[in-house]
Amino acid sequence: MKRTVIMMLDSFGVGAAKDAEAFGDTGSNTFGHIAKACAEGKANDGREGPLKLPNLAKLGLALAAKESTGSFAEGFGDDVEVIGAYGHADELSSGKDTPSGHWEMAGVPVLYEWGYFSDLKDSFPKELTDKILERAGLSGFLGNCHASGTAILEELGEEHMTSGLPIFYTSADSVFQIACHEETFGLENLYTLCQIAREELEPYNIGRVIARPFVGTGPSDFARTGNRKDYAVEPPSKTVLDKLKEAGGEVVSVGKIADIYAHCGITKKVKATGLEALFDATLEQVKQAGDRTIVFTNFVDFDSHYGHRRDIAGYARALEYFDSRLPEMLALLGEEDLLLLTADHGCDPTWQGTDHTRERVPVLAYGAGLAPGSLGRRNSFADIGQSIASYFGLEPMEYGESFVA
């Protein structure tokens, strides 16, 4: 029985990519800088001491990161018996965003430029917002700027609740984000507004519209909920997910995977919010999975809760929790199953600003007869998609080189 489990540690980069300078990210290193902060006692909020990831280390994380950067992350070495194949990958895609990373690892790199709203203030063209407001029957909106999702709630959340006007904002990514209160504005109203925005944004080549619902009574207790929804454009060609689905296989999305691929190539969608619930749901879907199935989970909290918020200790806590549960996953795998752990970009919590960082990502592979040892540097995330295609005996992808026989 052949099954693939993909655990996407959203934003868990392992060192600056070869083209990081073009993004202002030279020297970024999500894993390395978290490990350094932990070793120096600077990440002791809710945890203590050096970063402890024994199970990820067994799968080859420390060695993959060393191959990427030239040195071990602090607190890690070669004193672990490695049971998996490990490597690191550079990105071909033009951006350091979520869709680009996910699509590329499924065999479809983004070789064109996304559209962006580059102005930090008055970010959106009036022609665009006028069309959205007219179709939605709204008199105006708040925001119109680059912002951190939590900071803008503190700044504009109360005004939004009293005025009924949605909050429009963006970032360095190709995104149009809309924040609205679930109770005063209404969740379905927010989703309808996002669908309108998605349609009106088509000429602008924007990768995603993101619904950012929140609850609370004021700045002190505003909190985003798990009802986020991404409205992505479709990948420009068929991914390995599409190819497996067309060949009669199953592709199970856990968390926001289906949204990222615009629901293309997905046969089953499982909603879960938070690291614990996402891990629980992944285990349950693996238990249920039959032959020729991909179970694909995005562990978004690493990025949304800790990377963007530059919360080093929180990121470390989350990694240690994830690591503590890996034995549960390994125990479910048959000898033919293939486990893949990777990331879609970096989001170094020690870096300036609040945006993603252009980094290499780990490629950790276990099972399916793979011998423990180095996979080396992969020239594209697409090597993962090509390997999945090879594993399932599918038609080869246009991009990528397989590391699975």
UniProtKB/Swiss-Prot annotation:
<dbReference type="GO" id="GO:0009117">
    <property type="term" value="P:nucleotide metabolic process"/>
</dbReference>
<dbReference type="GO" id="GO:0030145">
    <property type="term" value="F:manganese ion binding"/>
</dbReference>
<comment type="function">
    <text>Isomerase that catalyzes the conversion of deoxy-ribose 1-phosphate (dRib-1-P) and ribose 1-phosphate (Rib-1-P) to deoxy-ribose 5-phosphate (dRib-5-P) and ribose 5-phosphate (Rib-5-P), respectively.</text>
</comment>
<keyword id="KW-0464">Manganese</keyword>
<dbReference type="GO" id="GO:0000287">
    <property type="term" value="F:magnesium ion binding"/>
</dbReference>
<comment type="pathway">
    <text>Carbohydrate degradation; 2-deoxy-D-ribose 1-phosphate degradation; D-glyceraldehyde 3-phosphate and acetaldehyde from 2-deoxy-alpha-D-ribose 1-phosphate: step 1/2.</text>
</comment>
<dbReference type="GO" id="GO:0043094">
    <property type="term" value="P:metabolic compound salvage"/>
</dbReference>
<feature type="binding site">
    <location>
        <position position="10"/>
    </location>
    <ligand>
        <name>Mn(2+) 1</name>
    </ligand>
</feature>
<feature type="binding site">
    <location>
        <position position="356"/>
    </location>
    <ligand>
        <name>Mn(2+) 2</name>
    </ligand>
</feature>
<dbReference type="GO" id="GO:0006015">
    <property type="term" value="P:5-phosphoribose 1-diphosphate biosynthetic process"/>
</dbReference>
<keyword id="KW-0413">Isomerase</keyword>
<dbReference type="GO" id="GO:0006018">
    <property type="term" value="P:2-deoxyribose 1-phosphate catabolic process"/>
</dbReference>
<feature type="binding site">
    <location>
        <position position="344"/>
    </location>
    <ligand>
        <name>Mn(2+) 1</name>
    </ligand>
</feature>
<feature type="binding site">
    <location>
        <position position="345"/>
    </location>
    <ligand>
        <name>Mn(2+) 1</name>
    </ligand>
</feature>
<dbReference type="InterPro" id="IPR006124">
    <property type="entry name" value="Metalloenzyme"/>
</dbReference>
<dbReference type="GO" id="GO:0008973">
    <property type="term" value="F:phosphopentomutase activity"/>
</dbReference>
<feature type="binding site">
    <location>
        <position position="308"/>
    </location>
    <ligand>
        <name>Mn(2+) 2</name>
    </ligand>
</feature>
<dbReference type="InterPro" id="IPR010045">
    <property type="entry name" value="DeoB"/>
</dbReference>
<dbReference type="Pfam" id="PF01676">
    <property type="entry name" value="Metalloenzyme"/>
</dbReference>
<dbReference type="GO" id="GO:0005829">
    <property type="term" value="C:cytosol"/>
</dbReference>
<comment type="similarity">
    <text>Belongs to the phosphopentomutase family.</text>
</comment>
<protein>
    <recommendedName>
        <fullName>Phosphopentomutase</fullName>
        <ecNumber>5.4.2.7</ecNumber>
    </recommendedName>
</protein>
<dbReference type="InterPro" id="IPR017850">
    <property type="entry name" value="Alkaline_phosphatase_core_sf"/>
</dbReference>
<keyword id="KW-0479">Metal-binding</keyword>
<keyword id="KW-0963">Cytoplasm</keyword>
<dbReference type="InterPro" id="IPR024052">
    <property type="entry name" value="Phosphopentomutase_DeoB_cap_sf"/>
</dbReference>
<feature type="binding site">
    <location>
        <position position="303"/>
    </location>
    <ligand>
        <name>Mn(2+) 2</name>
    </ligand>
</feature>
